[in-house]
Amino acid sequence: MKLKNEIEYVFRILNYLSLQDKNRIVTSAEIAENENIPHLFSIRVLKKMEKKGLLKIFKGANGGYKLNREPKDITLRDAVETIEEEIIIKDRSCVAGQTSCSIIFGALEKVENNFLKNLEKVNFKELTCPHVPLEIEDEIK
């Protein structure tokens, strides 16, 4: 599985803003330069992040962006769902009587649930504090 560039940019923008003073307003140009994101693309992603409630936009000469929530309240799942409305591995449409299909999709459902739980467990406060161990499950249950 390969993440879209847009999702990676959301991760990088959230990480950058999480490291700033919570009252500091940061311009899109600063974010783009420091995170090596094409400026016009960063503006598009920032708008999606604001629409999802992750950022506040400040207009005008001294305008820019800052987090709308504390970094501890923003998870990797929030970030991914800024771009991907729904995170699913595969639609589960099996024809009646296909035993192998239902077994496969049952396993995929477990993988998907584990993946979503792990995305919800990791927040941007933890990601900006490298000495804090992440609570991620390694096993599929």
Language model region names:
Residues 71-96, 112-113:
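Conserved segment of winged-helix/HTH DNA-binding domains
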